[in-house]
Swiss-Prot record:
Site for Reactive bond 3, residues: A15, E16
Keyword list, A-Z: Disulfide bond, Glycoprotein, Protease inhibitor, Repeat, Secreted, Serine protease inhibitor
InterPro entries recorded: Kazal-type_SerProtInhib, Kazal_dom, Kazal_dom_sf
Protein name per Swiss-Prot or TrEMBL: Ovomucoid
Localization per record: Secreted
């Protein structure tokens, strides 16, 4: 399972609720929040699955 995070990080994310579960066992609100975190982690954060953890 993967998400295309090209074009990130973005300065602001919407409040859209489309949860993703990261490899850090944290639920991210949406793709934007998740991709920003992926960039911050230098690519060490990956997608565990779609939906809440």
């Amino acid at each position: 399972v993967s998400v295309d995070c090209s074009g990130y990080p973005k300065p602001e994310c919407t409040a859209e609720e489309t949860p993703l579960c990261g490899s850090d066992n944290k639920t991210y609100r949406n793709k934007c929040n998740f991709c920003n975190a992926v960039v911050e982690s230098n690519g060490t954060l990956t997608l565990r699955h779609f939906g809440k953890c």
